Amino acid sequence: MYQIAYIGRWETLPETAAAICDYDTSKLEVLLQGGLDLDVPIQLSEYIKLMPLEIAVFRNDVPMIHFLLEHGADPGLAEEQPLLLTAARCCGPEVVALFAGQAAKLSPKQKERAFQEVRWGNRPENILVLEQAGITVNKFGGEAFRAAVSEGNTKLAQLLLEKGADINYHKPDMVFPNASTAVTEAVPCPVFPNG
């Protein structure tokens, strides 16, 4: 059974994807010599296709990520989302730093999403790398801060607040259609002390 993060599970995978998941570098070397292009997506199922490097990042397979990069995989290509965002959720700071150069190309919404990815992946250790890449909590962390408060994640909420998250962030979205702030979200939350 092959698991690729939250993307899905498969009993079998195409040859290249299986070699990546099995860390079969010998098989990949043979495939590369036979003309494998690491910059072509692999169809995993009817609706899911991923780049080879993307599979390794989703699996947080650091040696395979390095292998694929050393063999010419383009870090700027991804089917799901920019690899910096995937790494922020699925990997540690070492891998996030590999893709930090993508920060300059991200839209403001994608930069906000970076902190949501940190929250979803429970990877607060990646915040420092994102900030060093120019994606700062004080400018882009408000959405993740409000969500962390709403779900009672006091550790992440405190960390984001200490790093300058906007306590008054109140843009509406699908989860918070009434444009609530973190403070109004904290009031009914039993994890945060009242008083």
Task: Label each region the model flagged.
Residues 5, 20, 32-33, 57, ...:
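Ankyrin-repeat helical core positions
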Residues 6-18, 41-54, 77-86, 108-118, ...:
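Ankyrin-repeat boundary/"N-cap" motif
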Residues 15-22, 27:
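Alpha-helical segment of the N-proximal tetratricopeptide repeat
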Residues 27, 63-64, 94-95, 125-126, ...:
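Conserved ankyrin/ankyrin-like repeat signature
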Residues 30-37, 66-74, 97-105, 128-136, ...:
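Ankyrin repeat domain, specifically the short helix-to-loop turn at the C-terminus of the second helix
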Residues 85-96, 100-102, 109, 113-121, ...:
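Core solenoid repeat modules with strong leucine/isoleucine-rich periodicity
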